[in-house]
Each structure stands twice: as structure tokens, then as C-alpha cells.
């Protein structure tokens, strides 16, 4: 059972049920507009039963939005900040309880779960690769090719070694590709995902991403088409000018200081 696929299914179904959501009241719309918020159509904004508009300031809503209760605080870089939506533009979003989104020029087709913080970013969006890079080919050991393997989020070095060292076993390769095809089909989502307690800060471009629990992306040059599998016990960090594309970044990974990780390439020793 894949925790990643289970989460994608839950998010695709909606982070709130219909019975947990309601329309904005006229009084709430009035409060939002006094706080310099605008919407193309306030009827497309649905909120949780215990929603209050006070923490939303200076935002623009240009598509559909689901918003939870934004009470509480999050800790960012060691400092507590109040949750809320501030000076940001939203196109089609799902935002859970206790989230902070501040100074984001474009947030499009994104789900942010409780405790997430997204700050000082240009574009965070989802669209071209709706499978987060699942099924991309990873080249192992031989730069000239011949030992490629299609990746999925929970892939291990042992699995990669077996598949790449048994290239003449067509039955094994066909079965592996069939399983990856099924995984690819189930990984499809209309949403980029920022999981519980994840941090995305000071980034110009974050595209087609699954950002796992407690992961941090801070001052990365570009991060796209990638799954980050992270946890509170083993958080992932991507920072300081890193460029990450078409990758799987697993528990405890740290990519920093101008590093480039593209097309999920890395070297793993294989038997000769």
C-alpha cells in the first residue's frame, strides 16, 4: 500500500466533504472586501463551517477556492506567525485549517494542508505534468544509457539494482513496467500538494509538485515535476539556489547550494 497514492486519492476527492462546506455570508463578503480582498465571483469561494474572514487580507481570488479555519499560528524559521492568506493571488485552490500563505504572486491548482506555510514566492502551480514525474526514466551507472529504470516515489536502491542488472529478463521488465504504468495512472491529480507542516519560501518557481510532510523548500531556483517523500522524523530540505526537476526526493534528503538534480539522475553501484 502506497501512502503517497492514498493521499493523492484523498486530495482528489476533496479535503472537505460537501456537508463540511458552506457559502460565504453577505457579512463575510463585506468584511473581506473591506480588507482589500477581491474575487471574480465570491460564489465560487466555499468555506468550512467554522471559517472566519479576519485573517484574509489583500488577496485576489480568480477561480474556485475551498478555505478552512485560518485561526492559529505556524512556526517559520524559528518565529511564530499567525495563520492567514495575505497579499496573494489564488486560482483554484484547496486550503485546509491553520495555513499561512503570504506574498505569493500566483498560487494555481494547489492544495495546502494544515500547518503548511507558503511565503514570498512568485509562481506555485500545477498543470503540464499531472503525475509529479512518476514514471520518468532514471539513468543508473552507465551515462551512455542501457540501464534506465522508470521511477516511482517509494523506489529503493535494491529494486533499482535488480531491474537494471537483469536487462535480459523480459518477463521481469514487462511486469515492472506494467506495475509502474498502473502506479502512473493512479498518481494523476489536478493538484500540486503542500502537505502538513511543509514550508515553501522565497522561490521563483515551484511547479507540479508533491511536497511531503515537514519538508522545506527555501530559496530554491526551481523545483518541478517531483515527489518529495518526507516526514517529521526525516524531513527533506531543498534550499540555496538548488534546481530540482523530474526527481524523487526521499526521506531525509538535502539538496543545497546551487546543486542541480534533473531527470532523476544519480549513480548507484551495480553488479557487473
What positions do the PLM features span?
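Terminal amphipathic alpha-helical/low-complexity segments used for targeting or macromolecular assembly
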Residues: 1-197, 202-208, 214
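Residues in short coils/turns that link rungs of repeat/solenoid architectures in beta-rich domains
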Residues: 97, 119-120, 207, 213, ...
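Glycine-rich phosphate/ribose-binding loops and adjacent secondary-structure elements
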Residues: 226-229, 235-272
Amino acid at each position: 500500500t502506497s501512502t503517497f497514492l492514498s493521499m493523492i486519492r484523498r486530495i482528489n476527492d476533496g479535503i472537505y466533504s460537501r456537508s463540511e462546506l458552506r457559502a460565504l455570508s453577505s457579512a463575510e463578503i463585506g468584511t473581506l472586501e473591506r480588507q482589500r480582498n477581491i474575487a471574480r465571483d465570491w460564489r465560487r469561494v466555499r468555506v468550512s463551517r467554522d471559517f472566519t474572514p479576519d485573517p484574509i487580507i489583500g488577496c485576489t481570488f480568480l477561480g474556485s477556492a475551498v478555505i478552512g479555519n485560518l485561526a492559529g499560528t505556524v512556526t517559520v524559521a524559528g518565529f511564530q506567525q499567525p495563520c492567514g492568506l495575505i497579499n496573494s493571488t489564488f486560482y483554484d485552490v484547496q486550503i485546509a485549517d491553520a495555513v499561512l500563505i503570504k506574498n505569493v504572486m500566483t498560487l494555481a491548482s494547489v492544495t495546502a494542508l494544515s500547518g503548511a506555510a507558503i511565503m514570498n514566492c512568485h509562481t506555485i502551480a500545477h498543470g503540464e505534468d499531472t503525475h509529479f514525474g512518476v514514471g520518468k526514466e532514471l539513468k543508473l551507472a552507465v551515462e551512455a544509457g542501457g540501464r534506465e529504470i522508470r521511477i516511482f516515489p517509494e523506489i529503493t536502491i535494491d529494486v533499482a539494482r535488480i531491474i537494471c542488472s537483469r536487462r535480459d529478463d523480459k518477463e521481469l521488465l514487462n511486469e515492472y513496467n506494467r506495475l509502474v504504468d498502473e502506479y502512473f495512472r493512479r498518481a494523476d491529480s489536478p493538484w500540486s500538494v503542500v502537505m502538513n507542516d511543509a514550508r515553501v519560501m522565497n522561490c521563483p518557481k515551484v511547479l507540479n509538485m508533491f511536497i511531503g510532510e515537514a519538508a522545506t523548500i527555501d530559496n530554491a531556483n526551481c523545483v518541478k515535476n517531483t515527489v518529495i517523500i518526507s516526514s517529521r522524523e526525516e524531513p527533506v530540505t531543498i534550499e540555496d539556489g538548488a534546481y530540482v526537476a523530474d526527481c524523487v526526493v526521499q526521506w531525509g534528503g538535502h539538496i543545497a547550494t546551487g546543486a542541480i538534480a534533473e531527470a532523476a539522475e544519480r549513480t548507484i553501484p551495480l553488479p557487473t
